[in-house]
């Protein structure tokens, strides 16, 4: 998860409140000190930290909780509200209004810009937009091929010419090419060869003049911490139509510093990079982000992931009928495991469920993910007949499946036991409830 170390430290501070029988001044001061320490270790600017914790302490000591809210709950709410303000208060979504909408992306060398552009293209494609990418990076020889390789599996086209040295010419031609193709969104990638803001902004102005983008997006490396302030400020002052993506938040100890520094400039953060996979780009919503960070969950985010799966996997009425008759086989179970993996890492999903964020040890989550992966390998070694009718799987078949999948007979038996448990559960479910759940969660994919 993005800022996991910071999240665990903040969650630990709030647990002191939960475990205490009374909330007094001494406890509030102790919790505030813990929050200060956690934020400073995440490279948040000391002045910002002191301002934030002063507000938390003053409010916690002076405000009376509303009727029906315990002092403990009220302090947690104050921490949540103040952290949300630190990271920008409200979400600012990316708007696609015109066809085509032209997005120009810029970033300092090593910011992860090319990978982020591929992620953004995939994000928009999943929301129904036809996207075209224009590579104007004439500086780095492999840039065009890297971008092409990242998006080719998703049928997203890249316009570029590794032999052309004129970036502005490439930008103009690429935009015209995709306009003729009738795409919804054109994303223009720039060189990213600059090591400081001044060169970057000069290039941005030149290409902006040539293609007139609807929005300019600055990609900032989250590992630089509070140094992000200067980049974001220079960028904000140079363009009135700018927004920001902060990358590499999954493994950075300084991510909190980067996010808070950018938010302090007033420049809108629209996305954050939370992993290496192409789907690891999230729209940034301070409220939901802080909720997950504190271990309070993100139900809305979980529902959105489920809806994405529903769009990707066509819902069929006969699938529901099959479940209603108890006709659940290993093929259906395989589809469910596939869908779970599409939702993202198990740890990321658990952090969206209130109370589960930091309660499971990392080792338990890792074992769970590994088990799901091995179940799929085992099913890949089964015949079509065995997947359709698991009841025919006897001991000699179990031995063959274990041999073919490089697993043990114990693991194959464990998978079959899990399958039988799920089948039994479906048979015992109330038929009307099952129909309702099937329509809500799409049994062709995620299931329940």
UniProtKB/Swiss-Prot annotation:
GTP binds at residues 107-114, 189-193, 247-250. SMART domains: AAA, SRP54, SRP54_N. InterPro entries: AAA+_ATPase, P-loop_NTPase, Signal_recog_part_SRP54_M_sf, Signal_recog_particl_SRP54_hlx, Signal_recog_particle_SRP54_M, SRP/SRP_N, SRP54, SRP54_GTPase_dom. Signal peptide: none annotated. GO terms for biological process: SRP-dependent cotranslational protein targeting to membrane. Involved in targeting and insertion of nascent membrane proteins into the cytoplasmic membrane. Binds to the hydrophobic signal sequence of the ribosome-nascent chain (RNC) as it emerges from the ribosomes. The SRP-RNC complex is then targeted to the cytoplasmic membrane where it interacts with the SRP receptor FtsY. This is Signal recognition particle 54 kDa protein. It comes from Thermococcus gammatolerans (strain DSM 15229 / JCM 11827 / EJ3).
